[in-house]
Regions:
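Active-site-facing substrate-recognition patch
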Residues: 2-62
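Short glycine-rich phosphate-binding loop at a beta-alpha junction
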Residues: 63-70
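Short, glycine/charge-rich flexible loops or terminal/linker lids adjacent to PRPP-binding catalytic cores
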Residues: 86-132
Length: 207
């Protein structure tokens, strides 16, 4: 028997709203217009709750594993996998010899438009399985789309994509559309006034 750590919609929304206030602090706006979130990724208690919130909509889809790409997204993805009671699978930026033969794809980073690579050991997953893709941050969805394409190479079905923080540009299209995030950050940030952060709309939908 496994305890399933699910929160009510109201509790999940209240928790995310409280953290929106934390993330909106002007001191979190870094040079280059980046938002500092590393401390949240280092707090097990906070990540455990956020992982349970993100896992909630995907219990019915019954993924076989959670997929993320190294490195910053690993703690959040691990907590989502823990809440779902499934394995965490980590794609690599660089192939490691000790992993054996791998599948490698090229993908375009949404934030910088750079060509990057992503690899996964052939023995890590099996054809016919179902994956939930999780990452800590996305801007245009380039890395997320890379993970979706990587799963296609393995004949694995992607049942969803969950991201902790999503930064949106007004009117800008995503490279990958089907993303469920927890926090939405406006692309316009001010070092004096802070970032505009609010819960993702799906959290505000009544059960």
């Amino acid at each position: 028997v496994r305890f399933v750590p699910r929160l009510s919609q109201a509790s999940a929304l209240a928790y995310v709203q409280e953290l929106c206030g934390v993330l909106s602090d002007p001191g979190r706006v870094l040079p280059g217009n980046f938002l500092y979130i590393q401390d949240l990724l280092s707090q097990p208690d906070t990540l455990e709750v956020l992982g349970a919130i993100m896992a909630g909509p995907y219990f019915a889809a019954a993924p076989d594993f959670v997929l993320t790409v190294e490195t910053k997204g690993i703690p959040f993805a691990l907590m989502v996998a823990r809440a779902l009671g499934v394995q965490l699978v980590i794609a690599r930026r660089d192939h490691k010899a000790f992993e054996g033969s791998v599948v490698t794809i090229n993908y375009i980073s949404g934030s910088g438009g750079e060509m990057k690579t992503m690899s996964l050991a052939k023995r890590a997953v099996r054809p016919g399985q179902k994956a939930l893709i999780v990452d800590d941050f996305t801007k245009d969805g380039g890395t997320v789309r890379g993970m979706v394409e990587l799963m296609q190479e393995f004949d694995v079905t992607t049942v969803g994509v969950g991201v902790m923080v999503e930064r949106r540009r007004e009117g800008a299209p995503r490279i990958y559309e089907d993303i469920r995030s927890l926090f939405i950050v406006s692309d316009a940030m001010d070092a004096r006034q802070g970032a505009v952060v609010h819960p993702a709309p799906w959290l505000e939908v009544q059960e």
